[in-house]
């Protein structure tokens, strides 16, 4: 299986899982892309107005760094007067045994750590 193809399959499976969790949190999952092609794989938006930004990556330091960079750029563009700040920025990965928070505040969470 080509790595890019596997990445698309993994992203689809993650979105499915995120939708299940979002439903339990009274929320929805959306994809975001702006006119400059800055995108976010998943925006978890709750009915209370809170939201989190999620990039999905297979793993590896370079991919996690790219995802975190994208999240920080997108968060910097948000009009916090209208939308508020994101509750969290997360890179969801395929590999790893535990979740952690980077120095820049971005969460790195292996898919196996998503639970009730």
Regions found by a protein language model. Give the residues of each.
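A cross-kingdom feature that marks ATP-driven nucleic-acid transaction machinery
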Residues: 1-116
């Amino acid at each position: 299986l080509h790595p890019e193809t596997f990445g698309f399959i993994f992203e689809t499976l993650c979105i499915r899982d995120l939708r299940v969790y979002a439903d339990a949190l009274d929320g929805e999952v959306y994809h975001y892309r702006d006119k400059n092609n800055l995108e976010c794989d998943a925006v978890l938006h709750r009915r209370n107005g809170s939201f989190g930004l999620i990039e999905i990556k297979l793993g590896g330091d370079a991919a996690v760094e790219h995802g975190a960079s994208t999240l920080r750029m997108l968060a910097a563009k948000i009009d916090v007067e209208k939308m508020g700040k994101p509750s969290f920025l997360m890179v969801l990965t395929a590999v790893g045994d535990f979740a952690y928070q980077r120095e820049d505040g971005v969460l790195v969470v292996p898919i196996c750590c998503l639970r009730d």
